[in-house]
Amino acid sequence: MREETYYSVRMRASRNAPHEQGGKHISGGERLITYSGLQEAVDGLLHKGFSHSRGIPDFMQIQLESINEPIETIRPLPVAFHQSDTPEKGQAIARKLLQKAGIPPHMIEKAYENIAEYAEARGAVLFDIRAGERIDGRGNRGVRVSRMDWPSHDFQKWAFTHNMPENSRIKEAHAIAAKVCAHPGIIAELCWSDDPDYITGYVAAKKLGYQRIAKMKNAGDESGCRIFFTDGSIDTESCIHFLEKQPVFIQREENI
């Protein structure tokens, strides 16, 4: 990594009130960037916050802080795509993939039984597959995977190689999945967006890579889900610290 100061720039946007006061989540995003790219990063996050299909926010916060610790480098995950023409078929594919990742079927069903509750969390939930319960203790806040980015030139080369669209949604989702799967105690992630216009979701796992599923909900549905399945061996606080605080670059090549 070059000896240059990087900054974490994070945006969150909501409507009717800030998130912690019960406001409706509209959008969020972040970048890891050097000083020369700050203006472009802030402009991009501002545009993202005001162009989301969940509505126009009346609260937005953009936060900047310098990164004063080494930035870890993580390789992108292998990628695959599964066609599904109904949410039911998409969710069935997700269940099969979670089982292939090593999660017992009865624990998959136990997590699914609580999805309506988990969907209320603004971030992810940690689900222990030994105890069969949520363990993060964060309530509606959840766990927010943060302080990661995928340098644009590197992402563009990856997208070209894998015949993937060069859009920010895939870049951001894959970056989150790669960071999550890099933690040794997390077996898999199950995710679909709360964006009513975006119906594609994914299962990500060390064993499987990043497995996109075409349709996991109906258009117009504003409910989303993000569950991290843990193996029961983790120290919860250190896991959350890694997910929220450890700066990470996703990088397929040797040099940023």
Swiss-Prot record:
Cofactor(s) needed by this chain: Mg(2+)
Catalytic reactions of this protein: heptanedioate + ATP + CoA = 6-carboxyhexanoyl-CoA + AMP + diphosphate
UniProt keyword list: ATP-binding, Biotin biosynthesis, Ligase, Magnesium, Nucleotide-binding
Pathway: Metabolic intermediate metabolism; pimeloyl-CoA biosynthesis; pimeloyl-CoA from pimelate: step 1/1
EC number: 6.2.1.14
InterPro entries in the cross-refs: BioW (IPR005499)
Entry's Gene Ontology BP terms: biotin biosynthetic process
Any GO molecular function: magnesium ion binding
Cysteines joined through disulfide linkages: none
Keyword Zinc: no
Enzyme class at the top of the EC tree: ligase
Top-rank lineage group of the source organism: Bacteria
Assembly information from the UniProt record: Homodimer.
UniProt function note: Catalyzes the transformation of pimelate into pimeloyl-CoA with concomitant hydrolysis of ATP to AMP.
Stored HAMAP family: BioW
Family, per entry: Belongs to the BioW family.
Protein's UniProt name: 6-carboxyhexanoate--CoA ligase
Organism field: Bacillus velezensis (strain DSM 23117 / BGSC 10A6 / LMG 26770 / FZB42) (Bacillus amyloliquefaciens subsp. plantarum)
Gene for this chain: bioW
